[in-house]
């Protein structure tokens, strides 16, 4: 895992097309902005895990 330190307003690049910017810090919460092409899915981890779990559940087709 790469660990980086960024200040509010600073950005990091992921590849050529994705940027992650620190928008603010309040207590133990960090607000970040992600700028990515439409074809790149961006989800919070808990949402991504839910999507993956739904994909593996059998569907009822009666």
Curated annotation (Swiss-Prot):
SUPFAM superfamilies to which the protein is assigned, alphabetical: CsrA-like
GO cellular component: cytosol
Gene3D superfamilies per record: Translational regulator CsrA
Record bears the keyword Cytoplasm: yes
UniProt main location, coarse: cytoplasm
MF GO annotations: mRNA 5'-UTR binding
Pfam families: CsrA
Keywords, comma-separated and alphabetical: Activator, Cytoplasm, Repressor, RNA-binding, Translation regulation
Location of this chain's protein in the cell: Cytoplasm
Signal sequence, start to end: none
Gene Ontology biological process terms, A to Z: mRNA catabolic process; negative regulation of translational initiation; positive regulation of translational initiation; regulation of carbohydrate metabolic process
Described function: A key translational regulator that binds mRNA to regulate translation initiation and/or mRNA stability. Mediates global changes in gene expression, shifting from rapid growth to stress survival by linking envelope stress, the stringent response and the catabolite repression systems. Usually binds in the 5'-UTR; binding at or near the Shine-Dalgarno sequence prevents ribosome-binding, repressing translation, binding elsewhere in the 5'-UTR can activate translation and/or stabilize the mRNA. Its function is antagonized by small RNA(s).
Assigned protein family: Belongs to the CsrA/RsmA family.
Assembly and binders: Homodimer; the beta-strands of each monomer intercalate to form a hydrophobic core, while the alpha-helices form wings that extend away from the core.
Name assigned to this protein: Translational regulator CsrA
Upper classification of the organism: Bacteria, Pseudomonadati, Pseudomonadota, Gammaproteobacteria, Enterobacterales
């Amino acid at each position: 895992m790469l660990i980086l330190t960024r200040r509010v307003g600073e950005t990091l690049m992921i590849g050529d097309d994705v940027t992650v910017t620190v928008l603010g810090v309040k207590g133990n919460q960090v607000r970040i902005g992600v700028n990515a092409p439409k074809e790149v899915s961006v989800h919070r981890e808990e949402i991504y895990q839910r999507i993956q779990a739904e994909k593996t559940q059998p569907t009822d087709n009666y």
